[in-house]
């Protein structure tokens, strides 16, 4: 039972934390775990209770708790959630609520294309000078597409038409 709870603990410890090694959980993820696993019901256990218990079990100047401290916190929350049961039964009840749960991502916004966005981003529909900025595949040409570069090679610095003299005088 504790191993399943430990797996759930690690899944929530890593959630949203790029630098987390999943050995310790932050207060934010601890609250999310309690909310997503229905330990926090809003009546017997509130978000305030969860924050107080987290602060009680963590070290004085620490910001995270490890799995050992997490079990102590769950024991305290279990006694509040399951009144009338002894601490071990309450802990087992909390672990049963945690079984197989993952961090929920409800309400997370996804990118959508609204209205004329596809018209503006489709390079095949470009006209005029903007059309010349992209090749057939839609990839940008870079500086060649933005600026007209002239060929400055010639006999002297002021001569701009290399190879045109012979064509004129024939």
UniProtKB/Swiss-Prot annotation:
The keyword Cytoplasm applies. Residues 105-117 have a biased composition (Low complexity). Residues 129-149 have a biased composition (Basic and acidic residues). Disruption phenotype: Male subfertility with a significantly decreased sperm count and motility. Sperm shows increased irregular mitochondria lacking lamellar cristae, abnormal expression of electron transfer chain molecules, lower ATP levels, decreased mitochondrial membrane potential and increased apoptotic index. Only expressed in male reproductive organs, including testis. Expressed in elongating spermatids at stages IV-VIII of the seminiferous epithelial cycle in testis and in mature sperm in the epididymis. InterPro entries: EF-hand-dom_pair (IPR011992), TPP/p25 (IPR008907). One of its GO terms (molecular function) is tubulin binding. GO terms for cellular component: cytosol; sperm flagellum. It is found in: Cytoplasm, Cytosol; Cell projection, Cilium, Flagellum. One of its GO terms (biological process) is spermatogenesis. Belongs to the TPPP family. Probable regulator of microtubule dynamics required for sperm motility. In contrast to other members of the family, has no microtubule bundling activity. This is Tubulin polymerization-promoting protein family member 2. The lineage of its organism: Eukaryota, Metazoa, Chordata, Craniata, Vertebrata.
């Amino acid at each position: 039972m504790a191993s399943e709870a430990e797996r759930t603990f690690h899944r929530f410890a890593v959630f949203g934390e790029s630098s987390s090694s999943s050995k310790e959980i932050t207060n934010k993820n601890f609250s999310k775990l309690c909310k997503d696993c229905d330990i926090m019901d809003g009546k017997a256990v509130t978000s305030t209770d969860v924050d107080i218990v987290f602060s009680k079990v963590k070290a004085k100047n620490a910001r995270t708790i490890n799995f050992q401290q997490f079990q102590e916190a769950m024991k305290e929350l279990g006694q509040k959630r399951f009144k009338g049961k002894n601490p071990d039964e309450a802990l087992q009840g909390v672990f049963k609520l945690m079984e197989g749960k993952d961090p929920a991502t409800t309400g997370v916004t996804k990118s959508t294309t609204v209205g004329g966005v596809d018209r503006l981003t489709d390079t095949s529909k470009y006209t005029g000078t903007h059309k010349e900025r992209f090749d057939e595949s839609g990839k940008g040409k870079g500086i060649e597409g933005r600026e007209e570069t002239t060929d400055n090679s010639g006999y002297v610095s002021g001569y701009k038409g290399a190879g045109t003299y012979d064509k004129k005088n024939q």
